[in-house]
Swiss-Prot record:
Enzyme Commission number(s) of this protein: 1.7.2.3
Naturally occurring in which organism (per UniProt): Salmonella typhimurium (strain LT2 / SGSC1412 / ATCC 700720)
GO biological process entries: anaerobic respiration
Annotated NCBIfam families: bisC_fam (TIGR00509), PRK15102.1 (NF011682), torA (TIGR02164)
Cofactor: Mo-bis(molybdopterin guanine dinucleotide)
Record protein name field: Trimethylamine-N-oxide reductase
Cellular compartments per GO CC: outer membrane-bounded periplasmic space
Location(s), subcellular: Periplasm
């Protein structure tokens, strides 16, 4: 690299010269110019080309093409018959202007360390440092926090990270930090936070991530399929492990069944979803429910089933407990209000006759309820999840092929028959080696908190909250370390996040893209993408179709390092390197994982080749013998020998355990609770009349691939994230298709590009989650997001005292045509690289490929 010696600036030297900092002439042009603008220059005639490199991703397996060391194209793996359109954006994941190239430290933190001016976080001004200096600072901060405060001051978190059984950021972060000292852990997640807490109390398992009844059995036996807030066709594009996308063959078969009239599909959703549209807008019955009123509709369906004697009393008597305690509420004996169809009509906007007809259809033949996750991401989301089970129990078809309920149909290829195969191990975050700082003194604070309430811990340390039957005293967090996650994407109410961020002394982010979490961090470490390393992955999730080699496509870019190497070097600083690596390098770990899989296979009658043969010759192996499965079948066939994991062993329509918690917002049986804000005549709707959805996107996985210009060109409107709005609402506001609009409420404001569509019910708008935050004034609590991150607008409250999960679905806004100044979107650039004049030359002023 040119000027290599001049690039290493000691902290002391930097501080001495900081007074001479200037910005003009110091912005690294290669950090601020989109890489795609220079892509043509990178591929010269006669360039060395390598094609067909096999690897995997959250979006599917691909064959990569590399030209002169640059990842230029991704083609679908030949075994994937239904590839995702998103693989077109994978080269951009490696080569883009938002790529983190070097270790960086926020300017004022470099000047003052943990006593820096935290209001400057988000101004995007950083100085480049060497890896040694960055890791020294990381280690010194861990030491300082443990010695000064103890484990109650440190929180670490990870998220969707990248695919690969070995290179998982969450396991590596967890092990490295655990070898140094204890810290605050988190429970729950943002995807299914309410459902995963209530459902174990009701049916004994989380349900949300588990295999569903095999699609061939559903297609053979179901007469009615109810899609309740579930968009399978859109969401199955990306999975946790590398998807095989085999589930799409069953969607094709379902479409044929719907067209022929063999299966009736009902979609309960304010929006015509991608699944609804795929199956046929005129073929699917649409129940365009008012947002957040699903529980009144469920109660009215239950009331109709009971009052018209359409329910299965035998199933309730033999497989459930608590229906008798629930019934007085349903009939209005407690509050004088029967929860009938006429009552529900006023709330959910569905005609009472339609509600009654729906109940009759569901009871008339085999009905499969397919429940999504978005609905439970509202205030009191536990109640909807609970009522899904109650309705299925009243129908009496739980455990029958093509009947009952399921919460995971849109995820991980659910319903694809699973194969008799091997599940590879990986790099575990656990360790038996004691930490350097072995204190377990949390000073009376809780060592585990609900993840969706971690901002409460920062803003209100010492506050006591209830959580799933426990009392939690929120710890006084001083330092956070994030790897493979983006809290500014997944947590609600960004201006509240910024307020909390100012109270933290140190934030460290390890990532491969300059997300807003990195822009608001103090120390930023560049990690590789999955395309710059070797790994192994499952091919197919619930299908367990096979194992795939993830071959390195290109070399690590700039100074990016594998998470494994980052944390290994960190652990070396406190004499725990051997405990972290266990004496193995990357290929050593892959061989161990393979050998453990071979041992597992022997017990199942499966023979794997030796690792070298698989890696160098085969690259992919496929398992045989798909097996049919019926969810809850064993319980139905013998509830005594196969009880559920509830206190009674049965489905708990009434839960004494929950009742004994005495929560006013989650009681002993499912109920309707009014929301803190709700559209269509609900609280707050006169001021903020539009409900804002922030569901999973069409062209990315959460915030991953938002950096892809290739994909943004397919969906962005005027360079902004689209906001979808009904024609009636648009016309009333003078908004036309393609207009730039301001979406706002009391919590914040964003710009977005209007897409006027009759797929959205009046009073309903949508901005997909994962849009990158792009404030016009970085770090300002009143900033305007120039790109369109919906979490500027969402509300940061817990679902209830039971789950304390996210309530992102409880959000009202107003929308107006934007007429103000139109600043350029800068979210997809790198940082403002600050340097000491005449002493420090940014590498970006040289050849970026040196």
């Amino acid at each position: 690299m040119k000027n290599k010696d001049s690039l290493h600036v000691s902290r002391r030297r930097f501080l001495a010269q900081l007074g001479g900092l200037t910005v003009a002439g110091m912005l690294g042009p290669s950090l601020l110019t989109p890489r795609s603008a220079r892509a043509a220059d990178a591929v010269a005639p006669g360039a060395a080309t390598k094609e067909g490199i096999l690897t995997g991703s959250h979006w599917g397996a691909i064959r990569a093409t590399v030209v002169d060391g640059r990842f230029v194209a991704a083609k679908p793996f030949e075994q994937d018959k239904y590839p995702s359109k998103m693989i077109a954006g994978l080269p951009d994941h490696v080569h883009n202007a938002a790529r983190i190239r070097y270790p960086m430290v926020r300017v004022d933190w470099m000047r003052k360390g943990h006593q820096s001016d935290t209001s400057q976080r988000g101004d995007n001004r950083f100085v480049r440092v060497s890896w040694d200096e960055a890791l020294d600072l990381f280690y010194q901060e861990l030491e300082r926090v443990q010695k000064t405060y103890g484990p109650s001051a440190l929180l670490t978190a990870s998220g969707w990270q990248s695919t690969g059984m070995f290179h998982n950021a969450s396991g590596m972060l967890a092990r490295a930090i655990a070898l140094h000292g204890n810290s605050v852990s988190t429970g729950g997640d943002y995807s299914t936070g309410a459902a995963q807490v209530i459902l174990p109390r009701v049916v004994g398992s989380m349900e949300v991530y588990e295999q569903q009844t095999s699609w061939p059995l559903v297609l053979q036996n179901s007469k009615t399929i109810v899609l309740w807030g579930s968009d399978m066709v859109k969401n199955q594009q990306a999975n946790w492990w590398c998807p095989d996308h085999d589930v799409y063959q069953y969607y094709e078969q379902l479409k044929e069944k719907v067209a022929s009239g063999a299966i009736s599909v009902i979609s309960i959703d304010p929006v015509v979803t991608s699944t609804h549209d795929y199956l046929g807008r005129d073929k699917v019955k649409h129940i365009a429910i008012n947002p957040q009123t699903d529980v009144p509709l469920q109660l009215a369906l239950a009331h109709t089933l009971y009052s018209e004697k359409l329910y299965d009393k035998n199933f309730l008597d033999n497989y459930c407990v608590g229906f008798d305690q629930f019934l007085p509420y349903l009939l209005g004996e407690k509050d004088g209000q029967p929860k009938d169809a006429a009552w529900a009509e006023k709330l959910c906007g569905i005609d009472a006759d339609t509600i009654r007809a729906l109940a009759r259809q569901m009871a008339g033949d085999r009905t499969q309820i397919i429940a999504g996750w978005c609905v439970q991401r509202m205030q009191h989301g536990e109640q909807w999840s609970w009522m899904v089970v109650v309705l299925a129990a009243m129908l009496g078809q739980i455990g029958l092929p093509g009947g009952g309920f399921g919460f995971g149909w849109h995820y991980n290829g659910a319903g694809t028959p699973g194969r008799k195969g091997i599940i590879l191990s990986g790099f575990s975050g656990s360790t038996t080696v004691p930490p350097v700082h072995d204190s377990t003194d949390y000073k009376g604070y809780s060592s585990t908190i609900p993840i969706a309430r971690f901002m409460d811990a920062i803003l209100e340390p010492g506050k006591i909250i209830n959580w799933n039957g426990k009392s939690v005293k929120l710890p006084p967090l001083k330092m956070c370390v994030f790897a493979g996650t983006n809290p500014f994407h997944r947590h609600q109410q960004i201006n509240r996040i910024i307020e909390g961020w100012r109270k933290l002394e140190t934030v460290i982010a390890i990532d491969n893209q300059w997300t807003s979490t990195c822009r608001f961090a103090d120390i930023v470490l560049p990690a590789t993408t999955q395309f710059e390393r070797n790994d192994l992955d499952q091919f197919g999730n619930h299908s367990n179709r096979g194992i795939i080699a993830m071959k390195q496509v290109v070399s690590p870019q700039f100074e990016a390092r594998n998470d494994f190497d980052i944390f290994r070097d960190l652990c070396r600083r406190f004499n725990r390197e051997a405990a972290f690596t266990e004496g193995l390098d990357e290929m050593g770990w892959l061989k161990r994982i393979w050998q453990e899989g071979s041992q597992q296979g022997k017990g199942r009658g499966i023979h794997l080749p030796i690792f070298e043969v698989f890696w160098n010759q085969q690259e992919y192996i496929e398992f045989d013998h798909p097996q049919m499965f019926v969810r809850h079948q064993a319980f139905r066939e013998d509830p005594d020998l196969e009880p559920l994991g509830t206190p009674s062993g049965l489905i708990e329509i009434y839960s004494k355990t929950i009742a004994d918690m005495q929560y006013d917002d989650c009681q002993g049986h499912p109920m309707w609770f009014e929301k803190i804000e709700r559209s269509h005549g609900g609280p707050g709707s006169q001021r903020w009349p539009l409900h804002l959805q922030s569901v999973h996107p069409d062209f990315r996985l959460h915030s991953q691939l938002c950096e892809s210009e290739t994909l943004r060109q397919q969906y962005a409107v005027g360079g902004k994230e689209p906001v979808f709005i009904n024609p009636q609402d648009a016309s009333a506001r003078g908004i036309r298709n393609g207009d730039i609009v301001r979406v706002f409420n009391a919590r914040g404001q964003v710009l977005a590009g209007a897409v006027v569509s009759d797929r959205y019910a009046p009073g309903v708008a949508r901005i997909h989650e994962g849009a990158w935050y792009d404030p016009d004034k970085g770090g300002d609590l009143n900033a305007l997001c120039k790109y369109g991150n919906p979490n500027v607008l969402t509300l940061d409250i817990g679902t209830s005292q039971l789950a304390q999960a996210t309530s992102a679905h409880t959000t009202l806004v107003e929308i107006e045509k934007y007429t103000g100044p139109m600043d350029n979107v800068t979210a997809f650039n790198g940082p403002v690289e600050m340097v000491a004049q005449c002493e420090y030359v940014p590498a970006s002023q040289g050849n970026p490929h040196d």
